[in-house]
Amino acid sequence: TENTELRLRFQRNRDRDGSRPIFFQSGAENNCFPGTRSLGSYNSTSTDNTNQWYCGEIKPRDVYLNDAPVTQGFPPLLGIPSTLRGQPAGALIYDTRAGLPFSGVERDLDLFTASFRWDIMGSGYSMVLNGGTRDEDRKTGADSDHSQVNIIGPDINGVRALATGSSAARDTYEDWSGELRIESPQDDRFRWMLGVYHFEWENRNYRIDFASPGGQTRPSQIFDIINTGYFGSVGFDFTDRLSATLEMRSATERKGQIDWTQVPNVPAGPTAAAVYDSSIRGNDEWKSTTPRATVDFKLNEDVTLFAIWAKGYKPGGFNGAVAITNGRPLDESFKQEESVNYELGMKSQLMDRRLTLNVSVFKMTIDDIQLTTPITNATTGAVTSISTNQGDGEIKGLEIESRFAATDDLTLGFTYALADTKFTNGIDDFQFQITSGGGIFNPANPTDPARNLNGRGNGSIVGNPFPLAAKHTASLTADYSRPVFGGGYRLYVNSDLSYTSKKNIQVHNTAYTGSALLMGARVGIETDNWRAGFYGRNLLDESSAVGATRWLHSYLFGIPATAGPAATLDPGLPSTAVAAYSLPRGIFGTLRRERQIGLELNYKF
């Protein structure tokens, strides 16, 4: 009607994707930081390489999957011997049977959203109601050691066991959200807005194995989130040139988690015995108040200066049973991440509004940064990750955005972003291990000389950049469009070129994925109702890895006892009380999609 507007949208997705393109770089290729946590410390490997970590670019390599019987040969993984205790290792470590019943991603997703706006009695004051629901059923599976190793233990009650390091699961997700806002006319000199938001989410995880390829009937984990927030803003134009806006949001987020696994609970005291239960339960809540203040000043009709100050929060959560059963009870939960943000900038439209130029500088300070740490499940051997608070840090940066209408038909664009990140406080246990020659980090006594095996151990990550964050990103775009065939049709040509600098894969600041230069293009014919044309992605065939992270060289775990004591340490090494001999580090990465060229057809109705 004249005063109301309603929008409804329903979306159904059905995805059937193959295995993820993940490759593995063996610990036998490590080239820096010698020490005890290395393949060279074991007499069951084919290498004397004692390096614990890798320094340099992580480059793509072949992908090996354990999701189907092996029908052709492949090169063995570096560092694995041809025999173990006098027996051939091939059939033991490279089992030719499928190591897991499902690999890849299958997803059925239904989304529904609704938006209602009412101009209350035509007064200019508005009530806005937004809401949505999601219902998702997703199966995922992967060989989480990401290598050609495929160790399958003996059958369990006549059913094949999963390969060591593999995992598969079915997850169901249900969530809904709703938001109600009341706002004054936004072109008034004084304007305001008040609102409330509510969100509920539940995830049920079901284990997949060869006995239950569709997922077990009872969930192994249940996660839930309930978030309620109240928010508002006031804005005021002090003059025709100076205005300010103050926004505030107060939120409470409650997270719950249940792990149906036999795990030891955290002891009640230093002498208390571990108590086994059928479930580990977590239930906690985090509160936050996030203000944001913005001041705008118009130099003239074409140039506006602005300043922004804001606080932000990322709620904490639970790692649950996976942390407790693997000797990290202090990581059963992790804290809320907090940030303070400052930004100064300019927005402008110049040259008779043909040129849009926006520039800003910013600084962000972050406390209790949340990152992931890989660990091995002590029961299944599957490698997984937990969230941990790694310390504090800051980001300083610059952003430039511009668009230029070169002609009536051609528009050019340019963007650049600088993000200079660094930790200002933080300790990492593996940083101490690699710098000390393999010493076990003792948080109660970080300078313990007995564990500082080479005298150079230092767990500090202060000054190191954030992992997985590019310092430089930039892009160039060109959009060309003009009438053809008498004016009822338009020729369109779009092209883009983007650059991303290297990214360190972890807090150690030595291993990284390479820079990437990507080009895309589109060309075709369109009308108001339809579009037909060709597209190209990654036309330069950039091959650098999309991402990578530290992982575990896990073949030492899960070798049956019939092969003898395969993972025996070499003689003469430091005591296990002070030196680390847990699974040596390898690295996994994700391949980039190669050059793609295709045809696209779109029709509006």
Segments from the language model and where they lie:
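Outer-membrane beta-barrel domain signature, strongest for Gram-negative TonB-dependent receptors
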Residues: 1-192, 356
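Extracellular loop and loop/strand-boundary signature of outer-membrane beta-barrel proteins
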Residues: 97-102, 163-169, 177, 181, ...
